Amino acid sequence: MATVLFVEDDDQVRVLAESYLEEQGHEVLSAGTAPGAVALLAKSPQLELLFTNVDLKGEIAAGIGLAHEAVNRRPNLKVLYTTERNLTDGMKARFVKNSAFLPKPYTVEQLLATLSVHFRISPQARRQRVSV
C-alpha cells in the first residue's frame, strides 16, 4: 500500500480519484490547493507519492511549484503530474526529476498503469506487502 497525497482543485475529480485509489489499497490524503497540500505534507511523514494537478485554482503551474517544495522537504518523494492543458516543453522541463505525467482525461486503467510502470506501485505488490 502506498500513501498518496492527491492535489486536485476539481472537487468531483478529487473525490472520485481518492475513492478509487482507496479501493486499490492506498492511503489517500487530499487537498484542493497548494497551501492545503503543504500543510498535509508537513503532518504526514509516511507519504510516498504526490499526485498533483499542474494548475490549481487558477494558479498556472502551482502544482509544479508544490512538487519542488515537496521534493525539497522529502527528496525520495515520487511525483505524478496531471493536467488537461497542453504543456510546452519549457513547462515540462520544470517538472522535478524522476517524475511522470498523466494527461487528463485519464481512465482508471491508465492511472494504474502509470503507478505500476513509473513508480512500481501495483495492487499485487500491495497485497504481497500486506500479507507478509
Kindly label every feature range from the protein language model.
Residues 42-45, 69-76, 94:
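Conserved phosphotransfer cores of two-component systems
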Residues 106-119, 123, 127:
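C-terminal output helix
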Residues 11-29:
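Two-component/phosphorelay signaling modules centered on CheY-like receiver
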Residues 51-68:
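Conserved phosphotransfer microenvironments
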Residues 8, 83:
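Conserved acidic carboxylate
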Residues 84-89:
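Negatively charged, flexible loop motifs adjacent to catalytic sites
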Residues 30-49, 57:
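Acidic, metal-coordinating helix/loop segments flanking the phosphotransfer/catalytic sites
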Residues 92-102:
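As written
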